[in-house]
From Swiss-Prot:
<comment type="function">
    <text>Involved in the partitioning of the mitochondrial organelle and mitochondrial DNA (mtDNA) inheritance.</text>
</comment>
<protein>
    <recommendedName>
        <fullName>Protein dml1</fullName>
    </recommendedName>
</protein>
<dbReference type="GO" id="GO:0007005">
    <property type="term" value="P:mitochondrion organization"/>
</dbReference>
<dbReference type="InterPro" id="IPR036525">
    <property type="entry name" value="Tubulin/FtsZ_GTPase_sf"/>
</dbReference>
<keyword id="KW-0496">Mitochondrion</keyword>
<dbReference type="Pfam" id="PF14881">
    <property type="entry name" value="Tubulin_3"/>
</dbReference>
<dbReference type="InterPro" id="IPR019605">
    <property type="entry name" value="Misato_II_tubulin-like"/>
</dbReference>
<dbReference type="InterPro" id="IPR049942">
    <property type="entry name" value="DML1/Misato"/>
</dbReference>
<dbReference type="InterPro" id="IPR029209">
    <property type="entry name" value="DML1/Misato_tubulin"/>
</dbReference>
<dbReference type="Pfam" id="PF10644">
    <property type="entry name" value="Misat_Tub_SegII"/>
</dbReference>
<dbReference type="GO" id="GO:0005739">
    <property type="term" value="C:mitochondrion"/>
</dbReference>
<comment type="similarity">
    <text>Belongs to the misato family.</text>
</comment>
Length: 493
């Protein structure tokens, strides 16, 4: 068994992770059904509920601010014990004055799930929190509310990178967060494979996650750490954008060298398609679109017969850890195969010696860049995952496309469009399925991105921190420039 422990840090991260967990739950099979190719034990843990029944809950720790959990309770129906109404007042004989915050009303969707009834269709009006479309029970240890800050507070906003850094330091000093929150899940694993971390990178959660990753690397040594770093893509004032860029610069400088995979994700993406319908102001919508790519590209980590995800990411030299997330989507047309707009090799593989720059795929959705960079970028390494299109149906074409590339085992299950997804997001989708080509790509575009952050850091950040940060970003940038300007050097590897 190769288990993965997940950490979810903040509101935007929890919107994305909730879609991820709902999709994992949709793969469950029950008595009499064919065994799923997905190994559920990778992300889920067995346990025992309060009444002695067996439970199966996500192996995750969910952090968020006060007021951000909506109607999600720490103790749910699986783990709560019925309170004894006849309990006395103990040693206190005086009057009690109980002050309670007005409870958040449960949505009709959650009420129907609890009652075992068909759930109504979700809308942007009915989804107020990420918990409004959550379909799973979590272990009480998974729910960690940080009471020092309140969601969307105007008095104490959780925006500055240093605020998150200081909050982690204070909490870790008081509670030892790894020992309290992570170790119980890690010690249950037969063989811990990786730690997956969802976070935002352009606000205070960037500082919080940076210090968390420091502790994780110290504690778990060479274990893989995969970071999905979400950043705002909506237009904001110049001052706000500069603050976000400073936060992003600090986050990528602090986390990317410590991680095995660091993927910046723009939410919402800058460019979309006419066949993709979503509300860019709804985090429920935008993270559903992101999850279609993120969940698909990590599918190999959950398959019973696939164990090469890390080696595929590492490529030839293992030096490139910052990856772009990209995808193309078509509707599942019930058997009439649609070709996705891709050029070059279609295998699930890392870039080969045959010339990575010549085997670029043209993706419809780019979740990492805004399209302003160079179109003539060089690919150092790429992992592609197909869902819903059986390439072996056209064996002659596949044989030609695979020349020079190692073949990997393929699974062709379409990506599910679950009930908690926004309806009609993908035009023409049938049977609640879509075909997806998703990819993680390490390319020279990263150098352009970091160069922009270097410029911002050099102009705005204080003198005490400026030299260290700018030089550190420069070293990261150089690793995405060196070695590709001369094609013969690459092909001689």
């Amino acid at each position: 068994m190769h288990e993965i422990v997940t950490l979810q840090l903040g509101q935007r991260a929890n919107y994305l992770a909730t879609h991820f967990w709902n999709l994992q739950e949709s793969y469950f099979t029950y008595n009499g059904e064919e065994e799923s190719p997905v190994d559920h034990d990778v992300h889920f843990r067995p346990g025992v509920g309060a009444d002695g029944t067996e439970t199966f809950t996500p192996r995750t720790v969910i952090y968020d601010l006060k007021g951000a959990f909506g109607t999600l309770r720490k103790y749910n129906a699986l783990y709560e014990l019925t309170e004894d109404a006849n309990l006395g007042q103990g040693l206190w004989d005086g009057k009690e004055v109980i002050q309670q915050q007005t409870p958040i009303s449960q949505s009709d969707y959650q009420k129907n799930l609890d009652a075992g009834l068909p759930a109504p269709k979700l809308t942007t009006e009915t989804v107020r929190y990420w918990s409004d479309y959550n379909r799973l029970f979590y272990h009480p240890r998974s729910i960690v509310q940080l009471n020092d800050y309140e969601l969307n507070s105007m008095i104490m906003p959780f925006e500055d990178w240093s605020v998150g850094e200081d909050l982690f330091s204070d909490l870790d000093k008081e509670h030892d967060l790894l020992d309290r929150d992570v170790r119980p899940f890690a010690e249950e694993c037969d063989q811990l494979r990786a730690i997956q971390l969802f976070t935002s990178s352009d606000d205070a959660w960037g500082g919080f996650s940076a210090r968390y990753v420091d502790r994780l690397r110290d504690e778990f040594g060479k274990k893989s750490i995969w970071v999905w770093a979400i950043e705002g893509g909506s237009r904001v004032s110049r001052q706000t954008q500069l603050k976000r860029d400073m936060n992003k610069a600090r986050t990528i400088y602090s986390i990317s060298p410590q991680s095995s995979l660091y993927t910046p994700i723009i939410d919402p993406p800058s460019h979309t398609l006419s066949k993709v319908h979503f509300d860019p102001h709804s985090e429920w919508h935008t993270t559903a679109l992101i999850s279609s790519a993120m969940e698909s590209v990590t599918l190999p980590t959950r398959l019973r017969q696939f164990h090469d995800f890390e080696s595929s990411l590492a490529g030839d030299d293992g030096t490139h850890k910052i990856f772009e997330l990209q995808s193309s989507v078509t509707a599942d047309d019930g058997g009439n195969r649609q070709h996705l707009p891709v050029k070059g090799p279609l295998t699930e593989t890392n870039a080969s010696e045959q010339g990575a720059a010549k085997s670029q795929a043209k993706f419809e959705l780019d979740f990492t860049y805004d399209g302003r960079g160079s179109s003539n970028s060089h690919i150092f390494n790429q992992l592609q995952v197909w869902r819903g299109t059986n390439l072996d149906q056209d064996k002659g074409s596949v044989a030609q496309e695979d020349i020079g590339l190692s073949r990997k085992q393929r699974y062709y299950n379409s990506a599910p469009m679950f009930q908690s997804y926004p309806s009609h997001m993908f035009s023409g989708a049938k049977q609640n399925k879509i075909n997806v080509l998703a990819a993680l790509t390490a390319s020279s575009r990263t150098a352009e991105r970091i160069k922009v952050l270097e410029t911002v850091a050099g102009r705005i950040i204080g003198v005490d921190e400026r030299e260290t940060l700018v030089n550190g970003l420069g070293e990261i940038r150089e690793s995405y420039e060196t070695g590709w300007s001369n094609d013969s050097d690459f092909n001689d590897i």
